[in-house]
């Protein structure tokens, strides 16, 4: 019922493809009659939610276990959804993950892993012929359920670690003349593509399928930015653009201190609307190869149907207009007014969209430039900041601009696994009454508050007088993004 209610909205707002992510390490969600163990075991976890599974050992259990939580779609239910979507002129594209994100399969069929043991590997063993027998049997049943042009095979985030030490994978590489594990993955993707093509279907995969060489007729779904899709299109392959910083609906959409816990990033309605998936600057040879744009909702942190709707709507309206509207016809103010009307319409019909009209918007502290003694002054970094969290460079701490909600907004400096020692040089002796700095914590981004901040002053940059040490009272287990000013006030 939930899926069909979302399909109703997709049809209303002209979203014409439903990409159904049916398998992942956290659970197998489609009935495969040849392999009942997939829905007897791999679809169930002895934890109440994804959090418990992810941090509690990533185990599975039988469906009759008293602690079992999970489920799957029967083949009859899938046929019902596919037909419901067809009547709305929506094509349903299934995804069966391979070779990575396959912990749930390998827990049930450990012989398909490189180690031969459950709970060791997350990738299928590509050197094992049984792997291809299993995948082709699964895909045959999937093809029988979904009449879609494309079958999505995942292809993302394979660890490839097991392949590096696996005798079977080594033998496969020697036999096929493959020089590294990237080419080994490419071999698998090409072989699966040949199987799908023989069944009259086309292969679609995440942009990692570019690694090691792209299969001849593959279509790339670009999520790690736009580079993968552009590279595929330039090489004559079709691409679907879904870069995470514009299209990932599991990202927080407003003040993270009041919104539900979300993935470790930030995406506002306005940012989603600002995306142009096929700008003319890409060139006449590339633009026609870009098929469209897609919004993605990953549900690790989304435990209920109401929460899912809160994350999808109204940002999916922005995705729809990005796909259908020429850039020169887009007007965010006009769109925003219509989005508010749509939110009211959805609420009247029992949906649970984000209440856009009451959005906090940008972090208030980030809106007004700060003028103080340190503005524009030199910072001496005795501990270099990480290139991964470089903000706007050396002047970031004294440019007067405070960070927003998003650690990736080029205003937050970060350090990896080290204490930090730095000096703000005021250039001359001056009276100081307050010293302060903002810090943030993002549990799912592995960004943490300092244990403590020590403030000291010096006349010569050699001998420092401690003023105060301010401790941190936010536990590392706190999952909500949070922000805190550490400061000293005195004379």
Predicted regions and their residues:
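Substrate-binding cleft of carbohydrate-active enzyme catalytic domains
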Residues: 2-201
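Flexible loop/turn segments at secondary-structure boundaries
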Residues: 25-31, 99-105, 152, 158-163, ...
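Substrate-binding groove of N-acetylhexosamine-processing glycoside hydrolases
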Residues: 80, 89, 132-150, 171-382
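Core-facing hydrophobic residues within beta-strands of well-ordered domains
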Residues: 290, 430-432, 450, 483
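Disordered, acidic Ser/Thr/Pro-rich linker "stalks" and the adjacent N-terminal cap
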Residues: 362-429, 440-449, 469-480
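Short beta-strand elements bearing conserved aromatic residues within extracellular beta-rich modules
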Residues: 453-455
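Noncatalytic modules at the cell exterior or secretory-pathway interfaces
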Residues: 489-491
């Amino acid at each position: 019922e939930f899926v069909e209610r979302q399909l109703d909205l997709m049809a209303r707002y002209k979203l014409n493809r439903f990409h159904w992510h049916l398998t992942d390490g956290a659970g197998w969600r489609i009935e495969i009659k040849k392999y009942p163990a997939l829905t007897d075991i791999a679809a169930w976890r002895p934890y109440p939610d994804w959090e418990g599974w992810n941090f509690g050992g990533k185990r599975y259990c039988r469906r009759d276990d008293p602690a079992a939580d999970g489920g799957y779609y029967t083949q009859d239910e899938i046929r019902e959804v596919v037909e419901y979507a067809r009547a709305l002129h929506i094509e349903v594209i299934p995804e069966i993950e391979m070779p990575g994100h396959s912990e749930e399969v390998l827990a049930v069929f450990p012989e398909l892993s490189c180690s031969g043991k459950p709970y060791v590997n997350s990738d299928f063993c590509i050197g094992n012929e049984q792997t291809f027998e299993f995948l082709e049997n699964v895909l045959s049943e999937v093809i029988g359920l979904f009449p879609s042009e494309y079958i999505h095979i995942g292809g993302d985030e394979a660890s490839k670690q097991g392949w590096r030490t696996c005798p079977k994978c080594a033998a496969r590489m020697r036999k096929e003349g493959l020089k590294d594990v990237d080419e080994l993955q490419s071999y698998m993707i090409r072989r699966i593509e040949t199987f799908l093509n023989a069944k009259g279907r086309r292969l679609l995969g995440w942009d990692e399928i570019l690694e090691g060489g792209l299969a001849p007729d593959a279509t790339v779904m670009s999520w790690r930015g736009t580079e993968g899709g552009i590279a595929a299109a330039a090489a004559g392959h079709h691409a679907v653009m879904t870069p995470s910083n514009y299209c990932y609906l599991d990202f927080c959409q407003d003040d993270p201190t009041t919104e539900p816990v979300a993935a470790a990033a930030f995406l506002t309605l306005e940012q989603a609307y600002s995306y142009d998936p096929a700008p003319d600057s890409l060139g006449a040879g590339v633009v026609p190869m870009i098929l469209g744009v897609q919004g993605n909702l990953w549900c690790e942190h989304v435990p209920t149907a109401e929460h899912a709707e809160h994350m999808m709507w109204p940002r999916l309206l922005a995705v729809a207009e990005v796909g259908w509207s020429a850039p020169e016809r887009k007007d965010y103010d006009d769109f925003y007014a219509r989005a508010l009307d749509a939110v009211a319409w959805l609420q009247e019909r029992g949906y649970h969209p984000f209440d856009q009209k009451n959005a906090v918007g940008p972090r208030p502290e980030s809106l007004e430039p700060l003028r103080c003694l340190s503005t524009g002054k030199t910072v001496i970094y005795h501990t270099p900041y990480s290139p991964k969290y470089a903000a706007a460079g050396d002047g970031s701490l004294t440019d007067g601009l405070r960070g927003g909600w998003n650690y990736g907004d080029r205003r937050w400096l970060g350090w990896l696994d080290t204490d930090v020692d730095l000096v703000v040089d005021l250039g001359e002796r001056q009276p100081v009454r307050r010293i302060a700095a903002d810090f943030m914590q993002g549990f799912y981004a592995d960004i943490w508050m300092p244990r403590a901040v020590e403030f000291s002053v010096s006349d010569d940059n050699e001998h420092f007088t401690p003023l105060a040490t301010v401790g941190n009272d936010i536990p590392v287990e706190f999952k909500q993004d949070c922000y805190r000013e550490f400061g000293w006030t005195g004379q």
